A protein has these predicted regions:
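S-adenosyl-L-methionine
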Residues: 1-56, 60
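Poly-acidic low-complexity segments
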Residues: 17, 29, 64-72
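Conserved proline-anchored active-site loop of SAM-dependent methyltransferases
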Residues: 24, 35-51, 60-63, 70-100, ...
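Short, conserved loop/helix-junction motifs that constitute active-site signature segments
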Residues: 31, 101-106
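A short helix->loop->beta-strand "cap" motif at the edges of active sites that frequently abuts
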Residues: 56, 105-109
Length: 114
């Protein structure tokens, strides 16, 4: 069993419904972003699935996966102009801190966390 499948039932894992992702994408004009990072949305995430349908350029990773990705050490894609995701709440303070650090280091231009 993959690590993701083991953690999918954790109380910290709450999948974002498709209609919410569609509304967010419309509100922020998702097509205007050229390099997007979904740091908590690999596998079956609606963020990723909808991005595929829209042919968006993105990098999708997850805080727990079988590829060794970890939000706190994984680098965003080059020229990342948007990092967007619904991260686990148990790490919210650390996630917000790193998000602002990534902006300060010019590794991402903007972020949106649910």
């Amino acid at each position: 069993m993959k690590i993701y499948e083991q953690h999918k039932t954790d109380k910290d894992h709450i999948a974002t419904p498709r209609y919410v992702v569609e509304d967010i994408y419309n509100l922020i004009d998702i097509d205007s972003f050229k390099s997007i990072w979904f740091p908590f949305n690999n596998y079956d995430s609606e963020f990723k699935l909808r991005a595929d349908e829209l042919n968006l350029k993105y990098k999708a990773t997850h805080i727990f996966d079988d590829l060794g990705n970890d939000f706190f050490t994984t680098e965003p894609p080059a020229n990342c102009d948007l990092m967007i995701s619904n991260p686990p709440f148990s790490n919210q303070n650390e996630i917000i801190e790193r998000s602002f650090r990534l902006i300060k280091e010019n590794k991402i231009k903007s972020f949106a966390l649910l």
